[in-house]
Each structure stands twice: as C-alpha cells, then as structure tokens.
Amino acid sequence: MIRKAKAVWRGTGRDGAGNLTTDSGVLDATPYSFKTRFENEKGTNPEELIAAAHAGCFTMALAFQLQAAGFTPTELSTEAAVTLEKDGAGFRISQSALTLRAQVPNLDEPAFARMAGDAEKNCPVSKVLNAKITLDAKLI
C-alpha cells in the first residue's frame, strides 16, 4: 500500500507560501506557510499533520487490538501533541505525547494498559518517528 501527498512551495522559507494536497482529496491545496507553522496563522503545518497521523494511527491500532480481544470500545479519544524544537541550525520533532481517554465496557485496567502500550509501540506512525513517544492512557 502506498499513500501519497504533494507539497508545492513558492518563494523563500520565511516569506513564501505553499499548499498540500493528498491523493484522497482530503487535503486539496491546503495552505501552509512560515506563519501557519511558527506564528499560529490559520492553516496547517507539517507537525500538526504528523500529530493527526499519530493520533489516528495509534487509535486505530488500539481499536484492532481491542476487537481481537473481544472488546468493543464505546469511544477512544486520542490527542497527539508534537513538539518541534531547535536542533543546531535546524529543527527536529523531539516528542509526540499521546493522551488517550477510553470508554471500553468490561475491560480491566491491567489489560487496557497492556493493549494501549502495545498499540503505541506497534502503530506504523510510532515506528517511523525518531522521537520520544509518551502515552498517558486512562480508562474512563
């Protein structure tokens, strides 16, 4: 399986702007720029997209683990907070902090913690990130 996205950029790093498009069409010339990345202007940025990918991948991985164990979650809600920090002359993603709140009937805390930890370690996005990954998982 191959998934594709395209970035188009015009101008300098600080003053230019670009757009992102995915083959699925979910992103269609979605704008991004220095200001959307570093100054909170409306638009997206690579780190936000990585956070969305990590949250979605982890949550689906956990849903599959729960299904295999015979559990059906009422709701799995995951937030990923990706940290971008200075690294020499450039920047690096140093961390992705996952916060999960899960409603899973009849699941005990030890089994939940084990499955959440396994999902964090084994989701494809976790595997591709060269960053510290933390998980705060609570069964509610």
Feature annotation, model-predicted:
Residues 1-52, 59-140:
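Extended beta-strand/beta-hairpin segments
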